[in-house]
Amino acid sequence: MQRIAGITKMVTHRRWLGLLLLLLCVGYSHGMPHVLRFGGIFESIESGPSGAEELAFKFALNTINRNRTLLPNTTLTYDIQRINIHDSFEASRKACDQLSLGVAAIFGPSHSSSANAVQSICNALGVPHIQTKWKHQVSDNRDSFYVNLYPDFSSLSRAILDLVHFFKWKTVTVVYDDSTGLIRLQELIKAPSRYNIRLKIRQLPADTKDAKPLLKEMKRGKEFHVIFDCGHEMAAGILKQALAMGMMTEYYHYIFTTLDLFALDVEPYRYSGVNMTGFRILNTENSQVSSIIEKWSMERLQAPPKPDSGLLDGFMTTDAALMYDAVHVVAVAVQQSPQITVSSLQCNRHKPWRFGNRFMTLIKEAHWDGLTGRINFNRTNGLRTDFDLDVISLKEEGLEKIGTWDPASGLNMTENQKGKTANVTDSLSNRSLVVSTILEEPYVMFKKSDKPLYGNDRFEGYCVDLLRELAAILGFGYELRLVEDGRYGAQDESSGQWNGMVRELMDHKADLAVAPLAITYVREKVIDFSKPFMTLGISILYRKPNGTNPGVFSFLNPLSPDIWMYILLAYLGVSCVLFVIARFSPYEWYNPHPCNPDSDVVENNFTLLNSFWFGVGALMQQGSELMPKALSTRIVGGIWWFFTLIIISSYTANLAAFLTVERMESPIDSADDLAKQTKIEYGVVEDGSTMTFFKKTKISTYDKMWEFMSSRRHSVMVKSIEEGIERVLTSDYAFLMESTTIEFVTQRNCNLTQIGGLIDSKAYGVGTPMGSPYRDKITIAILQLQEEGKLHMMKEKWWRGNGCPEEENKEASALGVQNIGGIFIVLAAGLVLSVFVAVGEFLYKSKQNAQLEKRSFCSAMVDELRVSLKCQRRLKHKPQPPVMVKTDEVINMHTFNDRRLPGKETMA
């Protein structure tokens, strides 16, 4: 009985135990799984240490299991398999092994061939495949069991293109590591067809890490804007080799597509001046992210990075951060799937996981704020969307954030412009720059000294002072060098090659060109210019014409010959009009005998001769005894008086100047005069900006001048300004040059003068190589000098000379015969003419008397001459006819001027 009772008791205990197990199973079936396995497949070198992705995979799982915040009732385990790089068969076999164990998801591998093999298996069996490396997505992709946390490279390519636009690059070199780089940068490669960008594509050597031959070609080709598409290890090697080849200077600007640029050791390049830009997806500014990275650095000590990787200790790479976020995203999906169970799957049975579709949907719908920012997926293709990138750039303090980029709003540069301006002095301090210049007064000249001078002390001038002021503001040192070929810089039409200072800037033989270097369109295409420090134009330098003394008839010069002719015509016209009006107006006829009011005879004083005499008297401002009585004749007289008043006043005002000033008559007065003649030769400095202006001009006058100069190129072109000035002084030659230099020369040589005004308008600026970081800094310093008035002070210092005596400063000299001798000639001519007229009148009157007295002409002339020679006699007998004439036969001698009053009868 006891045995039976014991058996019964044991059975009862087993029933209770079974019931308890049943309840536990029921409870387990309605809650989250207690243990869930993830699979990880990672590439590694045989017997090598664990990679960063594998460590991040373990680190993420351990973090979730320790915190118990995300999955409080579930423990995550893992199965890690290692494969050789690019071994897709081994990757497939390892994936099948993990699926047979039962995994909820497979992470990795990284390389595309192995990843594609694993992806096809996961897609067939309905198991999520999680990737953290870039993979090329075809347009008809049907891999529904797939998500990728790496940003889509079409977006990254647009981000790089936005940077190129922001930096205003016109020439870009793309250097890629493998063929997938061309796919990743397709947006940038398409840019030349849509934007004005010249693109050159190069490939890194495939079988070696020696990039020096490629870098040498780039240096020879002056390729300063380069985009490197490679991993962080190759990027670190390229930077070291570029430093050894002298390609880590301020003229080079590199953009790296790797998101691990922030983790590279850039300490050797901080003070090199090189421009280095990249992107960072790791949100290091978040305190929680920083805390996780700090914990990661402790884990990383177990497997530090390889010495040749170029990575800094304690930095979490982008691949590791993406793997960490990938594990957490899948854990979020596990949290949302309470009844998920894993099962063993066989690759040869093609029986998919029954929870696969649901679990994959939960993963694509999951949201997580991870180390790499907000994580969302496109539910169609499984690609990541809505990610943010930090734009980082190398500064003297290291790599700093200068902006952000996201697919929605694009590039947003957030660099502190105020701080950037404040650091202008710091960025150039203690740097030594090579400055190219050219000898030209008063810009750069050799300093006159009894002692031998060396270095920068050999030079003086406006540009030397300007350079000294710029160096004082920006804190840099400099070495002043004369340009080797002595030219400013022009492009050869046949070869397209440049010379002079422009060439030295293009070849980076000089950092600055501080000289009278004009800012032109063609130069701006190959070099950069600062803001102008001087504005000017082209004008004509010519000999000052010799002064000519006024001639004896210079009193006629105040009025032009046309005006003299018009005055004569006006005088004749007014006199005739006055005569006609006076004849027609009844008020100009008057009684010649006022004492006899009954006289029927009236007289008109304005005969034709009297009308001419009236005009002469008014013109000479002497008047006459003739006065108009009618209103009409008074109007004519008043208008004529007003006319003569203005004419005489204008004549008098100009007469003094024309009699006292020596006339400076130049054969040319403007560029038009030069273009219309060929007697006076004219030219410019060869290969200068003035020559470029005439060569490129579309204005007909200047184009005609260029045809003349180009046809006589060897005879009219000069090598320097000094040669041009010498030709002006020694021959009949006009020199076209900058107005500021003409101003300087004419202040010191009174035999030279400027002809006409400015032909064009241009400016001088400080030249820098294309893309030089010094340009903006130089511009700011020039604007500061302008606001302080120092540019004007320097110009006054170097342009002010003794000056030439001004004409108006001369004392008035006494007038000589050569000034007003013509007046005496006119007077003498008038006297001689009056004598001849008097003789004519005497002869004419003698003839009339002879006819009246019925005697000979000679006797009448002798009598008249006898009376005329008796100077004291005032009276003489009036000639009488020999016979008496009847009263009614008396002829009125004024029949032409007298007329009888109307209504009166004629005399009987």
Swiss-Prot record:
One cellular-component annotation, GO: postsynaptic density membrane
Reactions catalysed: Ca(2+)(in) = Ca(2+)(out); Na(+)(in) = Na(+)(out)
Gene3D superfamilies (UniProt xref): 1.10.287.70, 3.40.50.2300, Periplasmic binding protein-like II
Any one biological process term the GO annotation gives: synaptic transmission, glutamatergic
Extracellular side: 32-561, 660-819
UniProt-recorded Gene Ontology molecular function terms: glutamate-gated calcium ion channel activity; kainate selective glutamate receptor activity; transmitter-gated monoatomic ion channel activity involved in regulation of postsynaptic membrane potential
Signal peptide: 1-31
Cytoplasmic-facing ranges: 583-638, 841-908
InterPro entries: ANF_lig-bd_rcpt (IPR001828), Glu/Gly-bd (IPR019594), Iono_Glu_rcpt_met (IPR001508), Ionotropic_Glu_rcpt (IPR015683), Iontro_rcpt_C (IPR001320), Peripla_BP_I (IPR028082)
Main location (coarse class): membrane
Subcellular localization: Cell membrane; Postsynaptic cell membrane
Binding site for L-glutamate: P516, A518, R523, S689, T690, E738
Glycan attachment positions: N67, N73, N275, N378, N412, N423, N430, N546, N751
Keyword Disulfide bond: yes
Keyword Ribonucleoprotein: no
Description of how activity is regulated: Cold receptor activity activated by temperatures between 10-19 degrees Celsius.
Role of this protein: Ionotropic glutamate receptor that functions as a cation-permeable ligand-gated ion channel, gated by L-glutamate and the glutamatergic agonist kainic acid. L-glutamate acts as an excitatory neurotransmitter at many synapses in the central nervous system. Binding of the excitatory neurotransmitter L-glutamate induces a conformation change, leading to the opening of the cation channel, and thereby converts the chemical signal to an electrical impulse. The receptor then desensitizes rapidly and enters a transient inactive state, characterized by the presence of bound agonist. Independent of its ionotropic glutamate receptor activity, acts as a thermoreceptor conferring sensitivity to cold temperatures. Functions in dorsal root ganglion neurons.
Subunit structure, as described in the record: Homotetramer and heterotetramer with GRIK5. Tetramers may be formed by the dimerization of dimers.
Family to which this protein belongs: Belongs to the glutamate-gated ion channel (TC 1.A.10.1) family. GRIK2 subfamily.
Protein's UniProt name: Glutamate receptor ionotropic, kainate 2
Organism: Danio rerio (Zebrafish)
